[in-house]
């Protein structure tokens, strides 16, 4: 039996030790994994970085059986899929996502990461700064989200960082399979629910 090929994109600031846990997980499921790394939050939300990524990106493979994104990694995936050179895929997994370029999602993330900003209307500030710049990006991303690929969304009832209203509507509209865990914080679902998480992947692979 040939190995599955997996494209893995982690969350903002993911450490190599965490990446290795997911690579080991896929190895145990008879899959080879390519990890696509981005440097920082600025790679996602700075237009000059977008341009550089889209111009210079070189995919490690032309096609992947599965793309596995965690949290904001789904935004970096969008940039890769709109680069001059890119890859195709058959199935996609959104762990603690999918994220969007919408200001509401950005505000939720900033408030969770930097609690002091809860006293500021980050959403309004962002809208005033770059609304025109983000309109095209949002539309492009929407087109990538609603492709006919098979989808699996993994969430936790305890996760307060995702835009839950959007994610639930996305699951319904896209027909994605959904597994919700009773425990586990944002972008940390596997380490808290190893057996259930692994079984969700196995079921999705066999689908």
What are these regions (language model features)?
Residues 2-42:
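Short, surface-exposed "cap/lid" segments of acyl-processing enzymes
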Residues 17, 160-166:
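Conserved alpha/beta-hydrolase "acid-adjacent" motif
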Residues 36-39, 179-185:
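Short glycine-rich catalytic loops that host catalytic nucleophiles or stabilize transition states
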Residues 39-61:
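Catalytic nucleophile-loop/oxyanion-hole region of alpha/beta-hydrolase
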Residues 44-46, 184-198:
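Catalytic histidine-centered segment of alpha/beta-hydrolase-like enzymes
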Residues 69-80:
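Glycine-rich nucleophile elbow surrounding the catalytic serine of serine-hydrolase chemistry
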Residues 87-151, 158:
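The alpha/beta-hydrolase serine catalytic core
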Residues 158-162, 187-188:
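Acidic catalytic loop of the alpha/beta-hydrolase fold
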